[in-house]
């Protein structure tokens, strides 16, 4: 299926906007929707991808502090769904969880990078205005705790990634144990499995 719409889903971080809207700065989370899937980025303390997937437009998957604001059609793409998965995987090497920075590498930077690849367009500037203003007003960054901006969906994704790594380690240990047991049985030892 070619010529798929590329949609920017924008979420209002309304609890923060109560404070920043009087300054004319909105604080938004964003993700890119294509092929009925939405990809976004968030921070965590680990050196693997911070990119995660949610149901398009579903703010509840991000957590109670987010609400859906609007969908912006950015263009269309001829990439197939498999290609997009590979692109997102490659972007995950750059957008690692521990590389997240509220002002310099946030969800909106990711959305813009993915959009540029898929349809050749950046996201609208108003979506990431906070990052722009923070470069002009450095103390602004210290006013916004980074941990407030880790979506619940990403926390779930990180937990799953860590669980997968734990299972892989357990499988490797079990395989090593079986190999050891197998070599032990050749030497006359009896091992109960």
Swiss-Prot record:
Q: Tell me any Pfam family this protein matches.
A: Peptidase_C97
Compartments annotated for it: namely:
Cytoplasm
Q: Name one GO biological process term.
A: proteolysis
* InterPro entries to which the protein is assigned, alphabetical: PPPDE_dom, PPPDE_sf
Q: Where is this region: Disordered?
A: 165-193
Q: Which Gene3D superfamilies match?
A: PPPDE domains (3.90.1720.30)
Catalytic reactions of this protein: Thiol-dependent hydrolysis of ester, thioester, amide, peptide and isopeptide bonds formed by the C-terminal Gly of ubiquitin (a 76-residue protein attached to proteins as an intracellular targeting signal); S-hexadecanoyl-L-cysteinyl-[protein] + H2O = L-cysteinyl-[protein] + hexadecanoate + H(+)
Main location class: cytoplasm
- EC numbers: 3.4.19.12, 3.1.2.22
Q: Name one GO molecular function term.
A: palmitoyl-(protein) hydrolase activity
Q: Which organism is it from?
A: Gallus gallus (Chicken)
Write down what this protein is called: Deubiquitinase DESI2
Please name every pair of cysteines joined by a disulfide bond in this record: none
Q: Which domain of life is it from?
A: Eukaryota
């Amino acid at each position: 299926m070619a010529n798929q719409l590329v949609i920017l889903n924008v979420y209002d971080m309304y609890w923060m906007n109560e404070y920043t809207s009087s300054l004319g700065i909105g604080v938004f989370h964003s993700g890119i929707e294509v092929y009925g899937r939405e990809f976004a980025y968030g921070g965590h303390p680990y050196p693997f991808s911070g990119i995660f997937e949610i149901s398009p437009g579903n703010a509840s998957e991000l957590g109670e502090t987010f609400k859906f604001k609007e969908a912006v059609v950015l263009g269309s793409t001829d990439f197939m769904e498999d290609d997009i998965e590979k692109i997102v995987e490659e972007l995950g090497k750059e957008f690692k969880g521990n590389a997240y920075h509220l002002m310099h590498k946030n969800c909106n930077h990711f959305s813009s990078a993915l959009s540029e690849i898929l349809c050749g367009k950046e996201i609208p500037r108003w979506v990431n205005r906070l990052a722009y203003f923070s470069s002009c007003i450095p103390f602004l960054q210290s006013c916004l705790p980074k941990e407030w901006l880790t979506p619940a969906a990403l926390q779930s994704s990180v937990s799953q990634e860590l669980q997968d790594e734990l299972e892989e380690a357990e499988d490797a240990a079990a395989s090593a144990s079986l190999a050891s047991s197998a070599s032990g049985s050749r030497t006359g030892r009896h091992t109960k499995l």
